[in-house]
Amino acid sequence: MNVGVAHSEVNPNTRVMNSRGMWLTYALGVGMLHIVLLSIPFFSVPVAWTLTNVIHNLGMYVFLHAVKGTPFETPDQGKARLLTHWEQLDYGVQFTSSRKFLTISPIILYFLASFYTKYDPTHFFINTASLLSVLIPKLPQLHGVRIFGINKY
């Protein structure tokens, strides 16, 4: 065991979704969230699916698109300080398998939520707005862009 030895990554945020078992853990976490919401007695199935979708997308937005920097002291001399986690992922390379997974997972959850809510207009609007709020920041054209200066510093 190498005690006191630093990791080999300059910025560990860049490779976290490529860790072994991370995708399975992510899917199990979403599944557990849904089971917990279904176990609440006064939530109907459509409400549980919509809440699962909204909570998932809210968490994804906060952790991937709102929080900037890195929790580690990195030797990159502050290059990651102004980047969101999404922009740091896979060293900023577009269309990697991790980015595709994180892009397709809210879409699959949206389809499931839409199906189980029987395309009710209220749920459909909420789920669509939630989906767009996490898909639009993932577009390659918005890499490093701060709309209206929000989250600039």
UniProtKB/Swiss-Prot annotation:
Q: Which domain of life is it from?
A: Eukaryota
How does this chain sit within the bilayer?
Answer: Multi-pass membrane protein
GO CC aspect terms: endoplasmic reticulum membrane; serine palmitoyltransferase complex
Topological region Extracellular: 122-123
Q: Which UniProt keywords apply?
A: Endoplasmic reticulum, Membrane, Transmembrane, Transmembrane helix
Gene Ontology biological-process entries: ceramide metabolic process; intracellular sphingolipid homeostasis; regulation of ceramide biosynthetic process; sphingolipid biosynthetic process
One Pfam family, please name it. Answer: ORMDL
Transmembrane portions of the chain:
27-46, 47-67, 101-121, 124-144
Q: Subcellular localization, per the record? A: Endoplasmic reticulum membrane
What does the entry's domain section say?
Ceramides bind to ORMDL3 N-terminus and stabilize it in a conformation that physically restricts the accessibility of the substrates to their binding sites in the serine palmitoyltransferase (SPT) complex, hence inhibiting SPT catalytic activity. In the absence of ceramides, the N-terminus is flexible and permits substrate binding, thus liberating SPT from inhibition.
Function, as annotated, reads: Plays an essential role in the homeostatic regulation of sphingolipid de novo biosynthesis by modulating the activity of the serine palmitoyltransferase (SPT) in response to ceramide levels. When complexed to SPT, the binding of ceramides to its N-terminus stabilizes a conformation that block SPT substrate entry, hence preventing SPT catalytic activity. Through this mechanism, maintains ceramide levels at sufficient concentrations for the production of complex sphingolipids, but which prevents the accumulation of ceramides to levels that trigger apoptosis.
Identify its protein family. Belongs to the ORM family.
- Subunit notes for this chain? Ceramide-sensitive subunit of the serine palmitoyltransferase (SPT) complex, which is also composed of SPTLC1, SPTLC2/3 and SPTSSA/B.
Q: What is this protein called?
A: ORM1-like protein 1
Record organism: Xenopus laevis (African clawed frog)
